[in-house]
């Protein structure tokens, strides 16, 4: 998705309690400043706090998202799972799909594709994560890996206007290796090229 706004996404992971919700007040005040008029903030707390954050952020420039969803949109026997419709129903506007930690815990390109389809059907905006490992980077497979993840993740998806492409260099997470700005710029350009090639016949949203 492209527009003239800058998005900052705060993934809370498995952190936070009811007492944490009030911490957003300072961010709300900051977001009202004129210099941040083109900035949107997305908070992605645990499921247990989504509703509370939704209530706190009404009539602000802060949106609330979930950190994952099940690929099945109907109710069913999926213990411990939450689907996209349930997330949407409590006020969430975004959902993170394909995060490296979830990939490491069993998410596949196939399940990610099904989750994205499910989220789009529920009218959620998708933060689609992808990225290469340190081994893949060292073997100079970055572009190949990313192209494959994007291709499989967006299989048979024609409308990408509500998909945010989130490059997540797995090799920099917890390793102390910080990617250089020019390195990230180069990779973002490559990702745009990949997405344009993949979606050219379906959409003109990628710029």
Q: Language-model segments: which ranges?
A:
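Active-site loop-to-helix "anion-binding N-cap" substructures in soluble metabolic enzymes
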Residues: 1-207
